[in-house]
């Protein structure tokens, strides 16, 4: 997506490396959707800066259509439903890799998703659902809190992270607050995708997937080893990791979500908790 738009934002790319497999292989919203929605926002960065909340609302509508298309084309939007495996078990990881049909299916879906997103380039998204007031966000709020407390952050990522609101474009998937915590973690420990050599990529893949299985993490701090703990702590506090379960409702669009979030003391608390979980992990593993 970044290469198609000609706007390379390596730190933004680094931030989403832990969203693979539905948030640290937890089976939630497919990483192809998370990355694609973020890419849609990046494609329209100038419109976002020029038109503000109206463009952001339009981006959310476009990202929502992308999520809907993906679900219709491939039958599901979550990793657990698409792969049918549990990456936190040896048998699940082996089934995904061998004989290779499920992994190859994911690769084919990635290729189709890229073609879909490519066809969106150049589309005018300057006008969306009418909205007034200062908007509230999930992932962006967590990213801001973590940056203020730890100094770890990225301005561009904070601008674009609104796409995770309401479980990614209001579709009820991965909670935006948890997504924000994981992206903050990845700014510190994520993979530098463009500069990774092949052997480093394989080494990181193996270490990350082993760390999903063992109690004592191996090697240097890496996204999956630390990220699984963030997901676990968040799930213990919220009971779930997906917006539809946490909020117990669906959202019709920008204004509906803003009204809900403005009145939800519970979600405000989860946002603060997600930021605290991320800050604690960063403090522990960067020392």
Predicted segments with their positions:
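Acidic-glycine-rich active-site phosphate/pyrophosphate-binding loop
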Residues: 1-18, 142-162, 244-249
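Conserved phosphate/anionic-ligand binding catalytic regions in large, soluble enzymes, centered on
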Residues: 26-38, 168-183
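A structural-propensity feature for long, helix-poor, extended segments
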Residues: 47-92, 193-250
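Flexible, glycine/charged-enriched surface loops at secondary-structure junctions
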Residues: 12, 76-82, 123-131, 154-157, ...
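Ordered, small/hydrophobic-rich secondary-structure cores
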Residues: 3-84
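Acidic, carboxylate-rich catalytic segments that either coordinate divalent cations
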Residues: 92-124, 240-287
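A short glycine/serine-rich beta->alpha loop
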Residues: 18-28, 98-101, 127-133, 163-173, ...
